[in-house]
């Protein structure tokens, strides 16, 4: 069952769920807790690659990704990152999240931002049981105007569901977990599949 605001506050107070820095109770509503945008971004560089063969040999896929992805772009507090129409960018939450083996999290974008064309997570909105780290956001601007994104602005909300029991393979214990303990806007690691 989805956790209520009272249960989220209790889970934060007793350390069942850890969000650092801890959100104020004002950031907790009904069934969710707001998360903010961090200051790290990555974009696709101008490139001449005609395509990336996602099912190709791992070294070739990784080499192609390395050619087209930018290094981390740091945006200081108070400044803005501009996401132009039709552009995809990776970013990271300001908060780091730790979940136990019996709770799954879900990230939702804000409706007010979606109404301007901003998709906060293109597809990956599940936060696995056992997750520990910052959450990488997959931004896409489907609107008509560039959007200024500033570090620490409220960007989405997390809600949580308690499972019927702990999972046997929590994310932080899996040997093949590609994004374990991520703290940066980590690019795709599909070559590790």
UniProtKB/Swiss-Prot annotation:
Protein's UniProt keywords contain Transferase: no
Keyword flag Magnesium: no
Binding-site positions, dCTP: 110-115, 128, 136-138, 171, 178, 182
An example Gene Ontology molecular-function term: nucleotide binding
Active site residues according to the UniProt entry: 138
Sorted UniProt keywords: Hydrolase, Nucleotide metabolism, Nucleotide-binding
Any single Pfam family the record assigns to this protein: DCD
Region (Disordered): 171-193
Domain of life according to the entry: Bacteria
CDD domains for the chain: trimeric_dUTPase
GO BP annotation list: dUMP biosynthetic process; dUTP biosynthetic process; nucleobase-containing small molecule interconversion
Protein's pathway: Pyrimidine metabolism; dUMP biosynthesis; dUMP from dCTP (dUTP route): step 1/2
Matches recorded under PANTHER family: DCTP DEAMINASE
Subunit structure: Homotrimer.
Descriptive protein name: dCTP deaminase
Phylogenetic classification of the source organism: Bacteria, Pseudomonadati, Pseudomonadota, Gammaproteobacteria, Alteromonadales
